[in-house]
Design a protein with these regions (language model features):
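Conserved catalytic/switch belt of AAA+ P-loop NTPases
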Residues: 90-114, 122
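Interdomain hinge/linker elements that couple catalytic modules in large macromolecular machines
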Residues: 2-6, 132-312
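A short beta-strand-to-loop transition that corresponds to the Sensor-1 phosphate-sensing loop
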Residues: 109-114, 119, 135-136, 361-363
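Conserved alpha-helical scaffold flanking the Walker A/P-loop in AAA+ ATPase domains
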Residues: 61-78
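Conserved P-loop NTPase "ATPase switch" module shared by AAA+ and STAND
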Residues: 73-89
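A cross-kingdom feature that marks ATP-driven nucleic-acid transaction machinery
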Residues: 1-35, 39-53, 57, 62, ...
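Short regulatory helix/loop adjacent to the ATP-binding pocket of P-loop NTPases
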Residues: 114-129, 145-146
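Conserved ATPase-coupling elements of RecA-like P-loop NTPase cores
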Residues: 65, 84-93, 118-119
């Protein structure tokens, strides 16, 4: 699909304005997957805070400046990248923030969830805002690239949402990026969490999960296939989650009679990593954009919006459930081409009224309303999410 898209270094992300605003108030922690665009966003923000200084813990010269606290006191914005790898990083940040020059802003970026690196030390409570940078969504591509919803979804299903493969004009370059990314991801980033001899097993797990998207995650089966314990399999999945590679969608069991599914379902942040047919890729894309929607509502509004699934003992299933606190707000079923809602979706729509119920369809001729269930085109419906 030929689209005239801006390159990844020149395009503002949808979060840019929000992060810029928060930098004037508190320390900002910006996390997200490797190559999701954090460094590019940081450098774009630096242009509005000149003079600014960027320091990366993985660069030896920068690491020395960080440990000696020898950065420029005149910098209006300090960017610390991958600082969570530093021992006692929370204590360091608290001291740096409390002792900063007047009016100096601070942005901390990292490719892992900060809460994963739990450690003793000073609390940052009350000093920071958190933002999570996701790959592109339908809405963000429309807002930043000026494409239609249909064009945006088609590109995301073809290339995934990471800036470089998504925005490049060359499909070959996108494929080369994907192959290298899948190889390097586990080999390089996982070493921050595990030992060298575990990397091969984690790579095998990563490859297995690419083929099990949307299925209940039975850790005992994975453990058996990999010849490891279930406890180790759980830890490995948690590592992949912490690096924003995969995420689990947990079952919603409140007020659902005969609820069965204890196992979560597994999805990838980047649909381009999924191995499966068009239906599986569409389901993963919807899951990833729903997670982005939830994280945006949490980060921007402080709302307790969460993503779940429902499956009962008769194996009736609703693909996705959005909840705010203890209240279901949305029921979402995903189909590639089937426009007819199931009896179970109708039943759950009545059960959770006034929650919105929708069947989003990838290839839909005509939107429709069947009782309380809306049948909507996937591209248009996804364009209406919060982010």
């Amino acid at each position: 699909m030929a689209l005239n898209l801006s390159d990844s270094d020149s395009s503002d992300r949808a979060l840019t304005a929000s992060v810029r605003r928060d930098l004037g108030r508190k320390l900002v922690l910006l996390t997200g997957a490797r190559q999701a665009g954090k460094t590019t966003l940081a450098r774009q923000l630096m242009a509005g805070f000149e003079p600014a200084q960027y320091l990366n813990w993985d660069v030896a010269a920068d690491r020395q400046l960080i440990t000696q606290q020898a950065w420029s006191p005149k910098a209006r914005l300090l960017v610390f990248d991958e600082i969570h790898k530093m021992r006692d990083w929370k204590t360091f940040l608290k001291g740096a923030w409390d002792g900063r020059s007047k009016g100096q802003a601070m942005l901390v970026t990292g490719s892992a969830r900060m809460e994963t690196f739990r450690q003793r030390g000073e609390s940052l409570a009350g000093r920071y805002y958190t933002w999570r940078l996701h790959p592109f969504s339908v809405r963000e591509l429309m807002e930043t690239q000026g494409v239609t919803a249909a064009q945006a979804l088609a590109r995301l299903l073809e290339r995934g949402g990471f800036p470089e493969p998504c925005l490049t004009q060359s499909a070959i370059d996108a494929d080369r990026w994907r192959a290298q990314y899948a190889t390097d991801l586990v080999r390089e980033d996982v070493l921050d969490f595990s030992r060298v001899h575990e990397v091969r097993t984690l790579q095998l797990l990563f490859d297995l999960l690419r083929e099990r998207v949307g299925s209940p995650l039975k850790l005992s089966n994975l453990a058996q296939a990999l010849h490891i314990s279930a406890t180790t399999a759980t830890r490995y999945v948690e590592i992949l989650e912490a690096l924003y590679i995969v995420f689990r969608v947990t079952p919603w069991h409140r007020d659902v009679a005969r609820s069965l599914l204890k196992e979560p379902k597994i999805y990838f942040l980047d649909t381009g990593l999924v191995k499966g047919d068009a239906g599986i890729k569409l389901e993963n894309a919807v899951a990833a954009m729903l997670l982005k929607h939830c994280h945006h509502r949490q980060d921007a509004e402080g709302k307790a919006v969460t993503l779940h699934t429902i499956r009962d003992k008769e194996r009736n299933e609703i693909d996705f459930v959005l909840a705010e606190g203890d209240t279901v707000t949305d029921l979402v079923e995903v189909k590639l081409s089937d426009p007819v809602p199931s009896a179970y979706l109708h039943r759950m729509a009545e059960r959770f009224a006034p929650a919105r119920a929708v069947q989003v369809v990838g290839e839909l001729r005509q939107p429709a309303q069947h009782g309380r269930v809306e049948v909507a085109s996937a591209d248009e419906w996804l364009a209406g999410l919060a982010a």
